[in-house]
Amino acid sequence: MKFQLNGRRSMAVLLASVRVVAAVGLIVPLLFAASVTAWLLACALAILLAGSLVRWGFLLLIDESHFIASTPGLRVAVVTSFVPGAESLPMLERTLAGMQKLCYPHDTWLLDEGDDDAAIELCARLGVRHFSRKAKAEYQTEQGQYQRGTKHGNYNAWLSEIGFANYDVLAAIDPDHVPGSNFLTETLGQLSDPRIAYVQSPQEYYNQPASLIARGCSEESRDFYWISQRAFHRFGSPSVIGAHGVHRMKALQAMGGLAPHIADDLLLTLRYQMSGWRGAYVARVLARGLAPVDWRTYVKQQRRWATSLFDVKFFLYPEMVQGMPFRGRVVGLLQGLTFLQDGVAALCCAMALAALLVAGVPASLASALASPPVLTSATILLLTGLYPHLFHGPHRNLTFHWRAGLLRLVKWPYTLLALADVIRRRDRGYALTAKVGRATADRSFLWPHVIICGLIGATWILAMTLGSIQHLLPHVAAVAAMLPSLFLVGSSFIPAPAAFDPMLADGHADAEL
């Protein structure tokens, strides 16, 4: 395995060098085209290629954790939360059953936000311990550590009441994530290093077959979980992921519990790094959960994530950076980079399209786009971009991730809206991703794409009326720009599958590889 990884790294060095040359060959002719449209296109490409170059740098830094036998005698609590009405009992039952089967002595806890009778009965039947803060006024605050209706408030109530005093290790698992029986045996050994505060593993989905959106979510997350996180492991700074992870209670207590923020996992990562703690990353699939299966859930989730990441990056990270080691600064700087680069690049492309439709195609731009250096460089970049897929753990292949590309084209307006929310300091509040029933018929979330199509269409018609379009390129660009929006609007009328499908869950009853 080590030999194969080193061999792939050597090839990555060669291909990265080729990509740098190809990037120059693609961008420089556009710069010399001497037109605003060409410069905007060059800017968008430079932003996207810079992000790609960072990912290729991560390929060279990938480090693998080694299996370490678990230390016997640890007091371990395996915990999940539950919000009645937003999360289904059949889904919860599979998660609790999986938690009970973990191969290390532990207590399983359910943190029930609603003190639900059916959840209490389920816990009694499975032998799971039940906790609810519903009747505890001291754990029901409007803001802060115990904010009502939030995951961090729910966990912090249990930690203060029970967890910190009675356990050495917290294994936190979201209610839709079914752990494999090896979840604890694969992770607890990493805590034998007293510097390690937390252990992470990749986030995978068992409902990928449910829809195009679910498969796209899996594709677009692979670079992060199988490349970036493994590179950060080398420096002891992988990101905490809220879906499932293991924490040393002593370290978590020193942080004050889960961070009171929508991006509690990112903020907790930065707090750990600022305090000198390290993390470990086990690059093996140890649990599988649910991905969004419909457009509304997906774009709302992405906007919420982008808003929380931007808030941490712009307002909290600058205050924390002075006390951080270099590795912590890098984590804080690079987290959310994809959201930002996609939004800014899309904005540059939108302005370039407007210039094409209004002012026409400069001869220098048409010549540059059809030149051999640009065409050759674009082909090289497209084909070599497949190589990082060989680092994607169980998903190693050389296929195009077109679904992930489609999702990126769909979500960029919501990324810019998230950026606007943060700049205006608009608090959109905490929102839970519902994992019960089917998507509603509400399509109000489509308005950004309806406006995009309307603006492009109106400008296109006006340009043709005025006779400013004398080249095929503006027509092709206008159609290409509207296609993702039209696809989103049209496909939103196709009935979406249920958020939770018992058959898919049972098909991945054990997440071990």
Language-model features: locations:
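Long helical/loop segments within the catalytic core of UDP-sugar-dependent glycosyltransferases
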Residues: F131-Y167, S181-A263, R271-M274, W295-L337
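Short aromatic/hydrophobic "clamp" motif used to bind/position activated sugar donors
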Residues: L170
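The conserved acidic donor/metal-binding loop of glycosyltransferases
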Residues: I173-V178
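N-proximal low-complexity "stem/linker" segments adjacent to membrane-targeting elements
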Residues: M1-A97
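Membrane-embedded multi-pass helical conduit in multi-pass membrane proteins
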Residues: G25-I47, W56-I62, I68-T71, T338-G429, ...
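Catalytic donor-sugar/metal-binding loop of nucleotide-sugar-dependent glycosyltransferases
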Residues: P260, T269-R288
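A conserved acidic beta->alpha catalytic loop
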Residues: D112-I120, A124, A135-E138
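Short, acidic, metal-binding catalytic loop of nucleotide-sugar glycosyltransferases
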Residues: R94-H106
